[in-house]
Amino acid sequence: MAAYCSRVYHHHPVSPSTMQGSLARPSIHAGSASLTFRARPNSVSIVRCDADSPPEGSAVAGWAPPGPYTGRDPAARKPAWLRQRAAQGEKYARLRESLGELKLNTVCVEAQCPNIGECWNGGGGAGGDGDGIATATIMLLGDTCTRGCRFCAVKTSNKPPPPDALEPLRTAVAVASWGVDYVVLTSVDRDDLPDGGSGHFAQTVKALKELKPGILVECLTSDFRGDLEAVSSLASSGLDVFAHNIETVRSLQRIVRDPRAAYDQSLAVLKHAKNCKDGMVTKSSIMLGLGETDEEVKQTMCDLRAIDVDILTLGQYLQPTERHLRVREYVTPEKFDFWKEYGESLGFLYVASGPLVRSSYRAGELFVQNLVRRKKAELAPTLQ
């Protein structure tokens, strides 16, 4: 979702499992009241959490397990480059009013994205006066997630409300009326649905393409529990960019993401989406500042390029509340510039890298639009 849109930690306890490798971490369980650490030379710390049940109503209250990876790190001070003005501007106000009237959710609001003013105003920062390319990421399937990743502000529940059957058409009508050329669709995780919500996603894409055939559609998806048939269903719906976030490096997956997510599962989803349709553009995103090393970031970028991911975004993790994961490091703008250059050297066709970059950050800017249209044009002769 994004935007980094995963969820407040809340799920049923799972049995601990041991992961192999020098950087492996065991499973983390919700409701931990007891945590133990083991440090090994030349490795990151390992944390094990013994599960208790979360308190009643915790999904709404924003409950997450306490421990050494939550709270505020006194050594980490938010630098000046992360300070943003409150969102304002005519375009921002108009878009927010329109979304409210149509009862459409956006990950921009639900995940507390720091770029909401810039994106909704068309690239002009919080106050407007940009290049006119406004981007809003519509969040389908409700505003309540079935997973509990420990970095996101989206509320969670094991039994969210059923999907709105009219949402695909309502979304398509709304987006078509805005006159935009590029739209991002995302969703909460819906493990309660047989297909993980891929059918609902696909209906929305098809409705958009019917109402506005020339529009470019990016879908920022969940992993659908690794169900590749669900991936195929969405990938063949007519979308132009298939995005799925790997979120963090391999060693931090169990600390950062819900245990139902996995590094290799995310790679498999992206690889399958790429192979589903000729010319498919794929995209992923990495958060920095969670305790990852440079070598781990490089390896993650190489793993994404090995499956031919085209677009990569890198941004600073920001802690939504005291109950979420601590920020371990504020990465400098200069280091983000390095990661952009490194990504381009690996062959990514487009890299957005900066402290406030999120996975849907200015997704529809002209370079990306031209990239997608060029790929479609290159493919056209083979389809005739």
Swiss-Prot record:
Assigned keywords, A-Z: 4Fe-4S, Chloroplast, Iron, Iron-sulfur, Metal-binding, Plastid, S-adenosyl-L-methionine, Transferase, Transit peptide
Highest taxon above the source species: Eukaryota
Cofactor: [4Fe-4S] cluster
SMART domains tied to this protein: Elp3
Residues noted as binding [4Fe-4S] cluster 1 in the record, renumbered to the chain: 108, 113, 119, 360
Any one GO MF annotation of this record: lipoate synthase activity
Occurrences of domain Radical SAM core (ranges): 128-349
Keyword Iron attributed: yes
Chief location bin: plastid
Transit peptide start-stop: 1-48
SUPFAM superfamilies: Radical SAM enzymes (SSF102114)
Keyword Transferase: yes
Pathway: Protein modification; protein lipoylation via endogenous pathway; protein N(6)-(lipoyl)lysine from octanoyl-[acyl-carrier-protein]: step 2/2
Localization, UniProt: Plastid, Chloroplast
Catalytic activity: [[Fe-S] cluster scaffold protein carrying a second [4Fe-4S](2+) cluster] + N(6)-octanoyl-L-lysyl-[protein] + 2 oxidized [2Fe-2S]-[ferredoxin] + 2 S-adenosyl-L-methionine + 4 H(+) = [[Fe-S] cluster scaffold protein] + N(6)-[(R)-dihydrolipoyl]-L-lysyl-[protein] + 4 Fe(3+) + 2 hydrogen sulfide + 2 5'-deoxyadenosine + 2 L-methionine + 2 reduced [2Fe-2S]-[ferredoxin]
Transmembrane regions: none
InterPro entries associated with the record: Aldolase_TIM, Elp3/MiaA/NifB-like_rSAM, LIAS_N, Lipoyl_synth, Lipoyl_synth_chlpt, rSAM
GO cellular component entries: chloroplast; mitochondrion
EC numbers: 2.8.1.8
Entry note: cofactor: Binds 2 [4Fe-4S] clusters per subunit. One cluster is coordinated with 3 cysteines and an exchangeable S-adenosyl-L-methionine.
Annotated residues for binding of [4Fe-4S] cluster 2: 145, 149, 152
Protein's recorded name: Lipoyl synthase 2, chloroplastic
Family from the record: Belongs to the radical SAM superfamily. Lipoyl synthase family.
